[in-house]
């Protein structure tokens, strides 16, 4: 029942318009300025329009017009705004009286302000036709192509091999001529094993070295992009296509290219060289032993010299300390003598001043006795002045004594500071020398 009654009340009320961004109806927005204790929420709002304000019809006419005054000026916009200049006067109209469905009438094409965009008669650009690429016949890479690409240049290897054999032949001929000129001894034919060891190994430029048995030697492809089982299958299919037989190269070798047998003189020279090398090694061993003994002796000498240097350093330090102590004692004695002499002089001067004061007092007393009582006042003033002078003299004497004592203390303190500085320097130098000596001993 309560819900139905509330709905009936809401239906009985008129449709309210709410302010933007607020849940308060526009007709109750003026209540925000009224205090809460004086508010009457069941009051109804009354529209109070000012009497002097223009009517709604005037605003509608202005809103529907292009400008406030009829003129042929262009439809310009206010700077920094999307509102046309002809509608700028609408900002002064209250929101309640604005008409938002006003539309600006469109201009005719015959109007003076209407300017259509010029029509372009430029023809579209001709499309660039590129020549069609010819499809090349793609070559399918097979295992045979890889095998062919990995084979070395046999002709180039043979030419280099022949050039090296020619050079070797020339060197052998030179050795033969030298052997004939030196001696005419018989040539001993060595065993096949010795001949094999004397032959020089010839290296190919592009292919690896091949074993001695050329009939069974096979060189397999070194760099392949196939896997191991695939390579084995290709080799079994191609059989001996990838093998290099060296029988042709061995047939090209002439008998003259075979290295000649060395003579007995060369063997003797080799034995002499071996003896010389043994002697040189013995001499080197002897020199090493001698150098070790000399180094040990030098180390012993250096250790003795270092010990002597340490003793000399200690003696010099002791002598310098003794000399410094004697100098300090002499300085103390001189300071004490000077202080005593100055004190004696000051006492003598004070005694003289005291005697002179006594003489003056005696003279003043005799004069006072002789003079009359009228002059007593003057004599009293004179006596007061004399007493002040005496006090001043005594104070000056005391000041002189204090100054002399302070000077003596200062000289004594400066002497002690100098002695401390000298002792610190001597200690630092001694420590540094000892560390240097220890470091030298460690190196040795």
Swiss-Prot record:
Entry protein name: Uncharacterized protein R10E11.5
Region (Disordered), start-end ranges: 1-35
Biased composition (Basic and acidic residues): 1-11
Protein species of origin: Caenorhabditis elegans
